Each structure stands twice: as C-alpha cells, then as structure tokens.
Amino acid sequence: MAIILITKNLEEEINKKFKKESIKIFEHIYSLKENPKKGKEIGVVGGILIKELKHKNHRFYFLVDGYKIKILSIKELSNCVLKFVRMSDKNTQQKVINEIKDILRKIGEEHFT
C-alpha cells in the first residue's frame, strides 16, 4: 500500500469548504492507498510527478516520485508516498497547476507542509 500525506492547510481547506461531504472526499483520496496509479498526470518538475484526482467539480493535486509510479507495479509501490498539496475548482485549475509547478521549480517539495 502507498502512503498518503495531506498537508495541514489542504486538510483544513477541505473540512471548511465541504463540511460533511469532506468524509467522502478523504475516502476518495485514501483509496489511492490501494491503487496509487489512479489520477490524471498533469506534469513533471525535477522528477516529481504532479497528478490530479477529481471529485465532482473540484480537483485535488498530489505529488509523487515520477520514476516509481511509472516503472513499478501496484504491489511494488508499498513505500511510495503520495503528498496531496492543493485543491481547485474548474475555474482556477490552471492557475493552481502553475503555482504548484512554480513552487517546485523554485523551492522544492519541502515548501508543501
């Protein structure tokens, strides 16, 4: 099983915005433990793959080691870490993707805590 990490800021944002529905969203996110290859690839910055997971009109962005996710089988991805960092709706999708890429280029993954 993969390891799922959600930044504190994103967790608070999900709970604030979705209230009761946040339980379903977290279940959807944690379903990646069993199938870490789920989600749409958005881009790669320095070997870090940016992917999105959709839930209705919202997208949740996570970072993963691009080499592991592409090469290893699902069974071999037991120590793979998926780090959820941001959320957007359809209107702000491209802006958020560009922000994630910019942060990864300038500062690196450590900025997302």
Where are the language model's segments positioned?
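Membrane-targeting and insertion segments and their boundary/processing signals
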Residues: 2-6, 24-27, 36, 70-74
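Arg/Lys-rich, positively charged N-terminal/basic patches that mediate binding to nucleic acids
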Residues: 1-25, 104-105, 109-113
